[in-house]
């Protein structure tokens, strides 16, 4: 095989509890993630330069070292493959939005490299390689919806919610995950309760799965990073408030932000909300939940 094309779907966090920083520098998390129809497009082709991963992104500049180059390097280390590859990425998922664009791209590339070079890695090895690239990457290998636990390496599949439509609002801010977690640690060190929702006992995959199965209007999900991100970027709270006022039955910030999303029950509700919010926000996109 000389080339292939792939899609890398974004995700939203319905829920994100963040625990203390671990010895390895990561924080323990308990999250409910679901993939959505917003996606980047990747085209892979063989390159006659051994050990080279050439990344081209026509609409968004990428740093020289990124999740794609890291994924390629780790793939080569594990498989012994040294053939070069050219990757063309059409970015639709905003960077710094909490929608997992970089991780989704890395997961798609790993699957694509495995196919392109015929290495037939086992699911376990592929997950291990993915986790070494980034804590969110394993989720994007196969899951449509899952409880994500530990440092991101533990996945408990969920039956995807497909009965809702989504509206994304991105305020145009790059919210770095490292900064968000550092801000959360500082708030906690000062004794600030970081998320009102943390009073609820939504802990563990069993409790999260049962809660996720309910109607979204009954969800008590929360995001531990709400307080630190919204203190730094108040416009994120405004965007979420706008979604609620536009009739969303559930709203949340995804990951470490800065994108927020709302869930709607039918096309007409979604159409009205999109028409209203597109006048206020330059990036406002309708999506479906993948199932």
UniProtKB/Swiss-Prot annotation:
Active-site residues, as the UniProt record annotates them: 11, 136
Pfam assignment, any one: GHMP_kinases_N
EC numbers, comma separated: 2.7.1.148
InterPro entries xrefs: GHMP_kinase_C_dom, GHMP_kinase_C_sf, GHMP_kinase_N_dom, IspE, Ribosomal_Su5_D2-typ_SF, Ribsml_uS5_D2-typ_fold_subgr
Binding, ATP: 94-104
Pathway: Isoprenoid biosynthesis; isopentenyl diphosphate biosynthesis via DXP pathway; isopentenyl diphosphate from 1-deoxy-D-xylulose 5-phosphate: step 3/6
Name listed for the protein in its UniProt record: 4-diphosphocytidyl-2-C-methyl-D-erythritol kinase
Origin organism lineage: Bacteria, Pseudomonadati, Spirochaetota, Spirochaetia, Spirochaetales
